[in-house]
Amino acid sequence: MKVYIETMGCAMNSRDSEHLLSELSKLDYKETSDPKMADLILINTCSVREKPERKLFSEIGQFAKIKKPNAKIGVCGCTASHMGADILKKAPSVSFVLGARNVSKISQVIHKEKAVEVAIDYDESAYAFEFFEKKAQIRSLLNISIGCDKKCAYCIVPHTRGKEISIPMDLILKEAEKLANNGTKELMLLGQNVNNYGVRFSSEHAKVGFSDLLDKLSEIQGIERIRFTSPHPLHMNDAFLERFAQNPKVCKSIHMPLQSGSSAVLKMMRRGYSKEWFLNRVERLKALVPEVGISTDIIVGFPNESDKDFEDTMEVLEKVRFDTLYSFIYSPRPFTEAGAWKERVPLEISSLRLERLQNRHKEILEEKAKLEVGKTHVVLVENRREMDGQIVGFEGRSDTGKFIEVTCKEKKNPGELVRVEIISHSKGRLMATTKGN
C-alpha cells in the first residue's frame, strides 16, 4: 500500500505529516511521491490565512481526477479542525476528515467511510509517537508542545489546535536520542509558544522549563545544534535570554514575531506587549549576543491600522534590521475576534504597505550582506553544490541562521561543521570559501 502526503503551511504541519507517515508505516504503508500511484492521498492543511484554505479545494479536485479508482482522499490538519464535516459536503470525493489534534487516529479513520475526527480537546501530548526508520536527516523537527493558550485577535490556531500542553520531557529526550542515532545533527523544536514550555503538562510531571529542556537536549551525543520556533516575545525575560546566550549548542538565531510595530495595533491584536517592550527585548538580546540573527513575522493592513501605525512598523524594521522577514497582508479568519470586525484597510493600501515593507527589507539585507565580507562562520553542511556534474562546494546555514553558498575543492559531507569565510554577496545572498579546516 502506498500513501502520498501533500503538506501545506508551517513546520508544525511538516512534523504532523511525519507523524502520519509513522502511524501508517505500522500498517505497511510506504510513502510515494506520485499521487497517481497512491492508495491513500492525504492533504495536511493550513488555515492561518485564507489563500491556502482556498487552495485546498482546488487540490482535492485535481487529486480526484488523477487518483486510482479505489484510492481514498483524506483531509488533515488545521482546516480540517475548523471546517469538519463541511469539507465532506463541499468535496464528496473526500473519504474522511482528521483534525490537527487527532493525528494518532489516522490508522482508525482510514477504515471508516466519511469519518470526521476533529476534537480539539483530545490529548495527544501523552501519545508517544514511535520513531520509525527513514532516510537519515541532518536537520529534524521535534514537537515539544501542542496547542496555544494565547488569544491573539487575528489567529485561528487556538481553535484548530486546542489548549496548550507541554509534551513530557522524557518523551522528548527519548525521541531526540533516536534522531541523533539516525544521523540528525540539528534539532528544530516546535511549538506555538515554545518558550512557554512547562506551564501545563497533561498529567503530573516534575516542573521543568524551556531553558532546562534546552540544557538536557544539549547533553545528547551527536546533536550539534538546536533551534526552535515559534517563541513568544512576552516570554523572553532576562533569565531566558541569558540561558539562550550561554548554551553553546543553541543556535544564535531566534524568531521574534513582531506582528506590528505599533503599540496601538499590538493592543488591538491582543499580543500582550508593546513596541517599547519588543525593542527592549531586542536590545537586551543584542547586548548578550551581538551577532544574533533575528527573524520576524509582520502583518500589514490589520483592521484600523493607520498610516502612523504602519510608520511605527517601518521604524522597528529600521531599528532591528531583521535578518529574515515573513510578511503578509491581514487575512480575516473565522472564529477570531478580528474576523468579526467590520473595519477593513483597503486592499490597495495594504498592498502598497506590504510592497514598501518588503522592498526596504531587501535593501537592509543587501546592506548587511556587504558588512559580512571578510567575516568567518561555522556552517553545517546541508547539500553539496554541483556544476556540470562536478561537486564544486556545498551550502548550509551558520549558527546565526545565515544561508551560505560555499565553494571548495575538498569533499565535505552533509552534517559536517565547516569554518568558512565570506568573500562576496549578491542580492543579499552570501558566498564563501573554506577557511582553516
Swiss-Prot record:
Reactions catalysed according to its record: N(6)-dimethylallyladenosine(37) in tRNA + (sulfur carrier)-SH + AH2 + 2 S-adenosyl-L-methionine = 2-methylsulfanyl-N(6)-dimethylallyladenosine(37) in tRNA + (sulfur carrier)-H + 5'-deoxyadenosine + L-methionine + A + S-adenosyl-L-homocysteine + 2 H(+)
Any single Pfam family the record assigns to this protein: Radical_SAM
Task: Give me the residues that bind [4Fe-4S] cluster 1, please.
Answer: C10, C46, C78
For this UniProt entry, what is the primary localization, expressed as one broad class?
cytoplasm
**Binding of [4Fe-4S] cluster 2, residues:** C148, C152, C155
> What Gene Ontology molecular function terms does this protein carry?
4 iron, 4 sulfur cluster binding; metal ion binding; N6-isopentenyladenosine methylthiotransferase activity
Q: Which SUPFAM superfamilies match?
A: Radical SAM enzymes (SSF102114)
Q: Does the keyword Ribonucleoprotein apply?
A: no
Q: What is a single cellular component term in the Gene Ontology annotation?
A: cytosol
Q: Where is the TRAM domain?
A: 370-436
The UniProt record lists the EC number as 2.8.4.3
Per the entry, the cofactor note is: Binds 2 [4Fe-4S] clusters. One cluster is coordinated with 3 cysteines and an exchangeable S-adenosyl-L-methionine.
Mind telling me which InterPro entries this protein's record contains? Elp3/MiaA/NifB-like_rSAM, Methylthiotransferase, Methylthiotransferase_CS, Methylthiotransferase_N, Methylthiotransferase_N_sf, MiaB_methiolase, rSAM, rSAM_horseshoe
Q: Any idea where the MTTase N-terminal domain is? A: 1-115
Domain Radical SAM core spans what residues? 134-367
* Subcellular localization, as worded in the UniProt entry: Cytoplasm
Per UniProt, the keywords (alphabetical) are: 4Fe-4S, Cytoplasm, Iron, Iron-sulfur, Metal-binding, S-adenosyl-L-methionine, Transferase, tRNA processing
Cofactor annotation = [4Fe-4S] cluster
Q: Does tRNA processing show up as a keyword for this record?
A: yes
**Known NCBIfam families for this protein?**
miaB-methiolase, MiaB/RimO family radical SAM methylthiotransferase
The protein's assembly and partners: Monomer.
Q: Which PANTHER family match?
A: CDK5 REGULATORY SUBUNIT-ASSOCIATED PROTEIN 1, MITOCHONDRIAL TRNA METHYLTHIOTRANSFERASE CDK5RAP1
Biological role: Catalyzes the methylthiolation of N6-(dimethylallyl)adenosine (i(6)A), leading to the formation of 2-methylthio-N6-(dimethylallyl)adenosine (ms(2)i(6)A) at position 37 in tRNAs that read codons beginning with uridine.
**The protein's name in its UniProt record:** tRNA-2-methylthio-N(6)-dimethylallyladenosine synthase
Organism listed in the record: Helicobacter pylori (strain J99 / ATCC 700824) (Campylobacter pylori J99)
Q: What is the lineage of its organism?
A: Bacteria, Pseudomonadati, Campylobacterota, Epsilonproteobacteria, Campylobacterales
Q: Report the gene name.
A: miaB
